[in-house]
Amino acid sequence: MNSSTNAVKRWWYIMPIVFITYSLAYLDRANFSFASAAGITEDLGITKGISSLLGALFFLGYFFFQIPGAIYAERRSVRKLIFICLILWGACASLTGMVNNIPALAAIRFILGVVEAAVMPAMLIYISNWFTKSERSRANTFLILGNPVTVLWMSVVSGYLIQAFGWREMFIIEGVPAIIWAFCWWVLVKDKPAQAKWLSEDEKAAL
């Protein structure tokens, strides 16, 4: 089996999935700044101190659950972990558009930090399962490009949604794609090459 053909096949199958998943995670994490400029602080009475607390709560959840998430992804299943996380962070993002008080918002931001904590380590583990050592640096670079690329398109989309509907609707609408994508992820993704039906036995053996 030609190794270059095998590599191209994996790149075109795996990396778009990885890119979309990480891009959606960044979208639901970063759109709070757009809402802040659109009036969420005034509507909910968020002071500068509370705004700092909300940011701290997100990263507190992110900090404490990143290692447990990585351990689960390594020992159990990246596929199952990201499937659950996609649904939960999409739900958290949409629920943000429905909150009417600061305690509820604080709880949602903390939970969002928890469920997004596993995304980066899980994606790195997933890439390591599917790419050789010589390929991983390029694959990881493509993954990280999800951040700046997402900023470009989310600025346009979020700006339009806020202008057309408002900050609440922006959160609700932007949370839905992650939930839908969770089921696409479940169908498309396998933890290891040996489980993939779209690879031949020779291609699996080459990995």
Task: Identify the role of each PLM range.
Residues A30, F59-I67, A117, V151-L152:
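Residue-level signature of mid-helix packing/kink "hotspots" within the transmembrane helices
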Residues L86-T96, L112, E174-W181:
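MFS 12-TM fold signature
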